[in-house]
């Protein structure tokens, strides 16, 4: 969904560029807090007050970080900084305290290559999972129709007047 804000309002909001990771600061449920998405749009976007923008840098790829936010290690860290009862929140200041494990921290070039490989593998798993999730119900529906067709064919005996004796 696209929506636009006035240029004046956009100046006051945080900018989101292609490859940035946007995290929710606030949610009514624990799973929604710090949920991440990688912005893939070509045009600059903006976000409001209940989101934090992670800008990838020379040490961490955006998609690597987004995948990391789905891990138990991240959730354990997030738990320590989540505040609230009805509405849960992790402030941008607290998010900055979360540590991101990166491979080969002493060799940034190698680290980024490994991160890219990890992202590639996880993207493939995600595509396969999505394919199965979307394709399986359709396949089940087709098999059900096939079953019904053959069942009806096998159980459609000739009517008594058609039977030659």
Explain the meaning of each model-derived region.
Residues 1-165:
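Charged, alpha-helix-forming regions
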């Amino acid at each position: 969904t696209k929506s636009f804000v006035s240029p004046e309002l956009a100046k006051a909001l945080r900018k989101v560029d292609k490859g940035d990771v946007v995290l929710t600061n606030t949610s009514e449920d624990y799973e929604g807090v710090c949920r991440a998405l990688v912005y893939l749009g070509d045009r600059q976007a903006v976000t409001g007050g209940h989101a934090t923008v992670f800008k990838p840098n020379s040490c961490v790829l955006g998609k690597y970080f987004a995948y990391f936010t789905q891990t138990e290690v991240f959730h354990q860290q997030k738990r320590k900084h989540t505040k609230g009862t009805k509405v849960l929140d992790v402030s941008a200041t607290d998010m900055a305290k979360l540590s991101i494990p990166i491979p080969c921290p002493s060799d940034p070039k190698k680290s980024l290559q490994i991160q890219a490989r990890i992202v590639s593998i996880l993207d493939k798993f995600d595509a396969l999972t999505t394919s199965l999730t979307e394709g399986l119900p359709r396949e089940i529906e087709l098999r059900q129709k096939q079953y019904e067709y053959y069942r009806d064919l096998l159980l459609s005996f000739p009517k008594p007047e058609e039977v030659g004796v």
